[in-house]
Amino acid sequence: MLSARCLKSIYFKRSFSQLGHIKPPKHIRNEPVKPFRNIDLKDWDLLRASLMKFKSSSLEVPLVINGERIYDNNERALFPQTNPANHQQVLANVTQATEKDVMNAVKAAKDAKKDWYNLPFYDRSAIFLKAADLISTKYRYDMLAATMLGQGKNVYQAEIDCITELSDFFRYYVKYASDLYAQQPVESADGTWNKAEYRPLEGFVYAVSPFNFTAIAANLIGAPALMGNTVVWKPSQTAALSNYLLMTVLEEAGLPKGVINFIPGDPVQVTDQVLADKDFGALHFTGSTNVFKSLYGKIQSGVVEGKYRDYPRIIGETGGKNFHLVHPSANISHAVLSTIRGTFEFQGQKCSAASRLYLPESKSEEFLSDMFGILQSQNVVPMNTSASPISGGNLRGFMGPVIHEQSFDKLVKVIEDAKKDPELEILYGGQYDKSQGWFVGPTVIKAKRPDHPYMSTEFFGPILTVYEYPDTEFNEICDIIDNTSQYALTGAIFAKDRKAIEYADEKLKFSAGNFYINDKCTGAVVSQQWFGGARMSGTDDKAGGPNILSRFVSIRNTKENFYELTDFKYPSNYE
């Protein structure tokens, strides 16, 4: 008779063998965006109620380690997450992980690993599909409010982030995982059977998420976890409120204890401790280029020193100096509106945001005149909290605050330095105000030469640098675009001339991981535009597409032979 242990082992092996045969629901599609029109009164009422709930009192955000909530209890530091539109308002007091907490989180991830990856794919998938449904229904307005208040987004920017994109990540990753598991060797010789097993990575995954997209946090933890990995997650301090809500939703959806461990804390202290563990298996990162370079170097050093059991996977998406290139044949009105959206929505705090603009001399005056007229007439200047879409006053505004004082100070320096630089001219804006919130207005700066540092430096704010090129030098300007910046994240060409489009498409092949023709360089949609850049913008593993999941599996190929040998010699060994 088979022992209970043997039966359990057979069950788990069978669960792996069935991975490629379980299909996700056929109705998986992109989550529809709620438009929040004037007539959508119910949506507005529900949103206002959630905003009021989060503004009325400060929430205590704990650590979540092995399913246990750990509060400060006067033993741990607290980080006050404030409303960037009203920096006197504390939205959440975020518990900071100690060294012991980090150690416990790593241990919890290791201890949960076997049961989690042995759980059949169907069951793992069901958790993320349910979480997506909870986000898009029961928790929709709470998630919107937490993201709007904590991260400075208007309702539309929050909707396309923490609701639609987040839900899309979870749903489409289930589909992509099913497709990946189904990829098996296409040939088996007579008397043999070949099969591929998509194992999780050995060890645990360390996920480091940024402030600017709640959905990115879902991607960073969801992709590895779905594939059977366990995760230690360090969220951004300034997105802790929405990220903690995401954690609670996953738990409600059935996520087992220890699979994802939520540990906000000092970035350097937490990261150094995690990277020192021999079972560190992968880094899944979104953030600044300099931080990613530093982590990359530390991991490489750890490999050289023999610190790790395996070669850790490194998956990262960082910064960009993204371009809009306008050809003389372009529809100028469309290019203007696209550039306003691509540059100034969410205050330019998207890694994909347009930051450099190349205009033909013959169309420059028309383009800039139209742009400035629109910016002024529509009052796209978030100079006080009463006008901010997340202050509780005007919920319909286009722009809001930048995330915190450090960002505000950096952007102010960019503006003030531009005023002193004889090779730069501020054409529009340059306003800022921190009396109540961290507000920087839309700013357009003209550079006299295409290699000025303002054409290559990422600002991560509502600042656009413009260079005017002679109409006859379109080909040359494509060369300049390709060689100006260390980044290669997003870019766009605006033109009606098909030859110009074809030339730019080919010449700028390696200048952007996401290239747009007659559209703004932001707004990638899961499953439609797989997102990620190369060069110093990251490892280009394409979040929102199927490739990203392959980075979190280790493939084992098994050959089973059904024939028994009768001789050790091959035919060619006989005379």
Swiss-Prot record:
Residues engaged in binding NAD(+): G297, K298, I299, Q300, S301, G302
Substrates-to-products reaction catalysed: L-glutamate 5-semialdehyde + NAD(+) + H2O = L-glutamate + NADH + 2 H(+)
Anything else known: Present with 17200 molecules/cell in log phase SD medium.
Keyword Protein biosynthesis attached: no
Enzyme class at the top of the EC tree: oxidoreductase
SUPFAM superfamilies: ALDH-like (SSF53720)
Induction of expression: By proline and is regulated by a common control element encoded by the PUT3 gene.
PANTHER family reported for this sequence: DELTA-1-PYRROLINE-5-CARBOXYLATE DEHYDROGENASE 1, ISOFORM A-RELATED, DELTA-1-PYRROLINE-5-CARBOXYLATE DEHYDROGENASE 2, ISOFORM A-RELATED
Originating species: Saccharomyces cerevisiae (strain ATCC 204508 / S288c) (Baker's yeast)
Subcellular location: Mitochondrion inner membrane
Source superkingdom: Eukaryota
Key words, A-Z: Membrane, Mitochondrion, Mitochondrion inner membrane, NAD, Oxidoreductase, Proline metabolism, Transit peptide
Active site: E317 (proton acceptor), C351 (nucleophile)
GO cellular component: mitochondrial inner membrane; mitochondrial matrix; mitochondrion
Family statement drawn from the similarity comment of this UniProt entry: Belongs to the aldehyde dehydrogenase family.
Name of the protein in question: Delta-1-pyrroline-5-carboxylate dehydrogenase, mitochondrial
Record pathway: Amino-acid degradation; L-proline degradation into L-glutamate; L-glutamate from L-proline: step 2/2
Protein EC: 1.2.1.88
Coiled coil location: none
